[in-house]
């Protein structure tokens, strides 16, 4: 038998836009991140105690064009602001269909005791992502604000995503899980028609 679980990536902390792999130190900066570190640690201890191979999938922002609320469209319609260029952060994304395939592969693939970043190859700042989505949906680009200005317009949860900047390395996902991204970046993911999931499609 095997064990697989989903986790987050916020416990990497703010890395100033640097590339981060699974061996990086965990520096949780929020209560939510601390809870995720605790949960991931518990999974690892349980699996090792019983000799069960496990994979912990570290998952960034999930999007899904075929599901309600699964894209930035509603944020654009609400004119939700983003940060000015000098303060902007790198974000990480994964299409829901690619995530489903990663989950499948983590359960049927080679035995492993590891964490795996499950993210695409987008390499985009948040404003670039939102600007591209605006072009796709033929909406206005989001307004830009400084960190001080934007605090009055966003929830604490939304603000927390703008306080950390990092780019996740996905080499382990491609080599250890063997996942070939169907949607390599959000450019394909937001514009292509979703295809039915089948386990044999890596």
Regions found by a protein language model. Name each.
Residues 27-55:
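Active-site Tyr-X1-5-Lys
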Residues 131, 151-180:
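Conserved C-terminal active-site "lid" loop/helix of NAD(P)H-dependent oxidoreductases
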Residues 184-202:
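Amphipathic terminal alpha-helices
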């Amino acid at each position: 038998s095997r064990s697989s679980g989903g986790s987050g990536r916020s416990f990497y902390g703010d890395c100033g836009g640097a590339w981060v792999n699974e061996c990086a130190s965990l520096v949780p900066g929020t209560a939510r991140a601390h809870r995720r570190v605790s949960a991931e640690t518990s999974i690892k201890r349980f699996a090792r105690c019983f000799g069960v191979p496990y994979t912990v999938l570290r998952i960034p922002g999930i999007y899904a064009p075929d599901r309600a609320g699964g894209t930035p469209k509603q944020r654009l319609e609400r004119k939700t602001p983003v940060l000015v260029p000098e303060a902007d952060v790198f974000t990480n994304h994964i299409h829901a269909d690619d995530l489903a395939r990663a989950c499948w592969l983590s359960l049927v693939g080679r035995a492993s005791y590891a964490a795996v970043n499950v993210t695409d190859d987008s390499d985009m700042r948040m404003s670039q992502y939102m600007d591209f989505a605006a072009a796709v949906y033929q909406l206005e680009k989001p307004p830009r604000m400084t960190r001080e200005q934007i605090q009055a317009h966003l929830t604490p949860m939304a603000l927390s995503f703008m306080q950390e900047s990092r780019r996740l390395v996905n080499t382990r996902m491609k080599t250890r899980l063997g996942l070939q991204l169907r949607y390599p970046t959000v450019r394909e993911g937001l514009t292509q028609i979703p295809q039915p999931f089948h386990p044999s499609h890596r």
